[in-house]
Amino acid sequence: MFTHLPLGLKMEVEDVTFSTGGNATNVAVTFARQGLQASYMWALGHDPASETILHAMDAEGVDTSAVVQDERYQSGYSVVLIATNGERTILNHRGYAGGKHPRLDYGAIHSADWIYPTSLGDGGLPLLRHIIDEAEKHKVKIMLNPAGPELAEPDKLKALLESVDVLCTNKEEMQLLVAGETLEELALHALHYVPVVIVSDGPNGVVATDGKTLVRAGMYEDIPVIDRTGAGDAFASGFLSQWSQGKSLKESIIFASANSTSVVTKIGAKDGILHRGVKLHEMPIHERPVNARDV
């Protein structure tokens, strides 16, 4: 492993892989591979990266009719440097998708059952508020896995949570929103804002609750990690792909964990995403009822 790249040298790398990324496209592929009607809504350019994203979505059966293309826009581009233990450094060019006011096809929200807003860039909380308002007007359910720009203003984010149906964060992110030291404390305290809460802590597992049942799960499998890119997207979208179809909290967490585990065994965020019908095995998991003292 290295901690810095020396200047003035040409360094050899073992392998190069090209793939599409971005939180929204990653989660859309999970939904599509689980047999759901998935649609990708965002603003892209006509640059090679944008066209590659569209082709990748089409190949996965993801509807791209809600994508707005503008010649002024340019998709982001990242170089991911992966160490032998699966940890990575990402060199990220954010691209441009309209800044704080991107051109989006908000009408695409109206016919959805669920939306999963993520990685809203410069639009931040105002754009998230607009998306949530559109969803509420048409009784569309919302799962939120907030990113850095949204978490940078936790008080404003909390004001939006009453409209969210499922909230998924890691432990450090949830501690920006509610008090608590353990995963259980954080998840239970977040029930004051959201009806379904998921809090993860990497190899230490995950806690999820719907206010009636609390599930604590460990790792699905203890396997060598090739690349952690997309693991969080795979977990959150894996959960929703099952929960939205009426599966139990326990079943949804098992699939989410399996999906995330599969993704980290491959290079890139999409190759390891599970397909419909895959056989899953049991995992370390504990389930108990939530009582009044908990909340």
Where are these regions (language model features)?
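Glycine-rich phosphate/adenosyl-contacting loop at the front of the ribokinase-like
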Residues: 1-43, 48-55, 59, 290-295
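Anion (oxyanion) recognition and catalysis
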Residues: 32, 58, 136, 161, ...
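A glycine-rich helix N-cap at a beta->alpha junction
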Residues: 56-73
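Conserved phosphate-binding/catalytic loop of the ribokinase/pfkB sugar-kinase fold
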Residues: 65, 69-70, 80-122
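Conserved beta-alpha-beta core of the PfkB/ribokinase-like small-molecule kinase fold
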Residues: 114-188, 204-206
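Conserved phosphate-binding/catalytic region of the ribokinase-like
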Residues: 151, 183-295
